[in-house]
């Protein structure tokens, strides 16, 4: 784990080592496997681009049942701030009619994006929708929607790494870093 990373004009310091992320993915995959293994259901695993690419890939490797992988691209952030609006940048890559869908998200904070996506999926006639997120900011989450699978909870800080970015950079780090408010470039 690097001591500090610089992305654009911001400096980030270590928050969660990759080994801890891997263990949390093992745990959340075990919960999903317990719910689906032997059920005969082939759910859609819906990767929310771009942030959940790494999480989805790691999660899929640990699942012990068949899944149908699809993706969608939504955005609600500009720089380090939420815009308050959810935009669909790329539509669903398949048909969810009559299917059970597990949304795979990188991070849930206020819940606006996940709430909008659940509405989209039910409007597209999904039979059932579950939510799996790598990270949850519980102090920010204010929606009645249940989150079925949560790998880790974190404080309300701006983070990068393991799929999460700051203006396009930082997704490729295997560790998660937090904005260093004391040391800015």
What do these predicted regions represent?
Residues 1-185:
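PRPP-associated nucleotide enzymes
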């Amino acid at each position: 784990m690097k001591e500090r990373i610089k992305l654009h004009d911001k400096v980030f310091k270590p928050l969660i080592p990759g080994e801890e992320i891997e263990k949390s993915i093992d745990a959340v995959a075990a919960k999903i496997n317990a719910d689906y293994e032997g059920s005969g259901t082939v759910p859609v695993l819906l990767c929310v681009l771009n942030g959940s690419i790494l999480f989805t890939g790691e999660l899929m490797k640990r699942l012990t049942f068949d899944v149908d992988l699809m993706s969608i691209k939504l955005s609600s952030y500009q720089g380090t701030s939420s815009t308050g609006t959810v935009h669909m940048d790329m539509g669903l890559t398949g048909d969810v009619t009559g299917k059970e869908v597990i949304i795979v998200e990188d991070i849930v904070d206020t819940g606006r994006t996940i709430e909008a996506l659940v509405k989209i999926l039910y409007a597209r006639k999904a039979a059932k929708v579950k939510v799996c997120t790598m990270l949850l900011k519980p102090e920010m989450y204010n929606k009645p929607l249940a989150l079925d699978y949560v790998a880790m909870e974190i404080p309300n800080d701006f983070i990068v790494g393991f799929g999460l970015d700051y203006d396009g950079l930082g997704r490729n780090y295997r560790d998660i870093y937090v904005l260093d408010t004391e040391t800015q470039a």
